[in-house]
Amino acid sequence: PFPLTSTDTTEYKINENLFDISATYKNFYLYTQLEYSDPPIFGETRTTIDKILNSYYLEYLNEKLNLKLGDIYSVYTRGLMFNTYQDQSTDFNNSISGVELSYLANDWLRIYSLYGTDTYEFRTRPDNQLSDLSFNHTSAFLGTEIHPISDIILNIQYLNQSLNISESVTNEGGVNTIGYYANLFTILGNDIAENISDFSTDNINSYQINADMLGLSLQGYLFGLDFYGEYASNKYT
């Protein structure tokens, strides 16, 4: 990790090892990523059996059906509605653990869906070795990919996210997740900031925030030109 008392780069030492292991059998595909790190660039040390499994999923694929169980890393359309990925260099991982399904109903219609839950961990400072804040979340996503005519694709999507924010999760400075979001210039942050006194004086330790998103995208190729447009609306309750 970063040296705490010196800026000498020779003191910056890491021992991070990643092992991608996969296997296939007929229509099944198994993927696992193991990590042995002592210490890693960012994140916690992983040297014991209960911590070295970094991610995994089992996938089944045929001509019409694609089913995946485990850690879900996916992007739909341009990612405005749903986008999960892993960036090892910054210890970022917003995947969910659950199930993902895609079904090709016919030549012009594909239906896809996923459901999962996980704990999202993040840092209040980019140079923190460990994540210091977190919240639990559950996502339910449903979409359709429609091909009305050749070279035109229409996507209609719905996403429900449920966030569980606990005041007991605080960083070293004593700021909890509610306080952190109140300082962000977002719709959710502004709403929390306007009601921060109510959050501070009530006897509730955990807050449930629901987000309902509707998305519409259109892409295609006409008259020698590629075009793409996407719209998403979000409502917090």
Q: Where do the protein language model's features map onto the residues?
A:
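Signature for the C-terminal beta-barrel architecture of outer-membrane proteins
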Residues: 2-14, 24, 29-53, 61-64, ...
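Short secondary-structure capping/turn segments at boundaries of alpha-helices and beta-strands
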Residues: 17-21, 55-56
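One-face residue pattern on beta-strands with alternating periodicity enriched for small/polar residues
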Residues: 18-20, 68, 100
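Short active-site-adjacent helix-start/loop capping segments
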Residues: 38-42, 68, 76-78
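A broadly used, surface-exposed interaction patch
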Residues: 54-57, 68, 80-82, 92
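Surface loops and adjacent helix of pleckstrin homology
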Residues: 70-72, 114
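Surface-exposed extracellular loop regions of Gram-negative outer-membrane beta-barrel proteins
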Residues: 73-80, 84
